[in-house]
Design a protein with these regions (language model features):
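C-terminal membrane-cytosol helix-exit motif in multi-pass small-molecule transporters
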Residues: 2-6, 13-38, 219-224
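A membrane-interface helix-boundary motif in multi-pass transporters
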Residues: 2-19, 192-213
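Pair of pore-lining "gating" transmembrane helices in MFS-fold secondary transporters
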Residues: 48-64, 146-150
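Short amphipathic helix-loop junctions that connect adjacent transmembrane helices
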Residues: 70-86
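Helix-to-loop junctions at the C-terminal end of transmembrane segments
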Residues: 101-114, 197-198
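Structural signature of the two symmetry-related core transmembrane helices
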Residues: 116-131, 207-210
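Paired small-residue
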Residues: 128, 139-147
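Intracellular juxtamembrane helix-capping segments at the cytosolic ends
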Residues: 154-167
Length: 225
């Protein structure tokens, strides 16, 4: 968005972004960890029990992220009537906030615990969605995007950590299953929101996302790992 606002061509903006990601990968490659799975470990295992429950929570958490990634600009443009050149500011605000919050997430989770981090994150994200949908000035909507970014930042990592520490399934398989369900949420979620927005409006669809995030916060009482 910043590069496009600076009048760079779309292709140049994409190439710069790809180059930056490749540079980060090369610089971080020396710190990657490798782990070999035992030969008798199945390649695919269906989640069950607590792992399936964690996966469903991950689906909802990623659905919230997907809503911001795919619908934030549409919301500002169509609902708040923001000029198209500024519609991407919500996306940028959300992603930058989530990135910074995720960098400091380990310290937060270590201080409050995984389950409390999920509760606080889900409540904060739900509050952010409600702020950006119910508060009219579009500048105030940016506060909502900040809250959603802060809230969503550490829900998924905490859920992945819970999946790795449970005893119902091997940790590596459980994390794989939970992450698969989670990323299904980030893929299918925006389509579900589009379907809901087509029938009930985008504000109602976003309120549905906030409700789902509140259910994540409530559901953590049944997380016994």
């Amino acid at each position: 968005t910043v590069l496009l606002s600076a009048q760079l061509p779309p292709l140049a903006s994409v190439l710069i972004g790809v180059g930056a990601m490749l540079l980060v990968m090369l610089l971080s490659a020396a710190h990657w960890h490798s782990e070999r799975m035992p030969h008798d470990t199945p390649m695919l295992a269906l989640p069950h029990g607590i792992v399936l429950f964690i996966g469903v929570l991950a689906f909802v958490a990623f659905l919230g992220e997907g809503a911001m990634l795919d619908w934030s600009a549409v919301f500002l443009s169509d609902v708040r009537r923001v000029d198209a050149s500024l519609a991407g500011v919500g996306y940028v605000t959300f992603t930058l906030t989530m990135t910074v919050a995720r960098l400091f997430g380990d310290a937060l989770v270590a201080r409050v615990g995984r389950q409390r981090a999920i509760v606080f994150g889900a409540l904060l994200a739900a509050a952010g969605v409600l702020v950006l949908t119910l508060v009219t000035p579009w500048q105030a909507s940016l506060v909502g995007y900040v809250l959603v970014g802060l809230g969503c930042a550490n829900i998924a990592p905490a859920l992945f950590s819970l999946a790795g520490h449970q005893t119902r399934m091997p940790g590596a398989l459980a994390i794989t299953a939970v992450s698969t369900l989670g990323f299904a949420g980030i893929l299918a979620g925006p389509a579900l929101i589009g379907f809901a927005a087509d029938h009930f409006g985008l504000i109602a669809a976003f309120i549905g996302v906030a409700t789902a995030l509140l259910l994540v916060a409530v559901s953590t009482r049944w997380l016994r790992v």
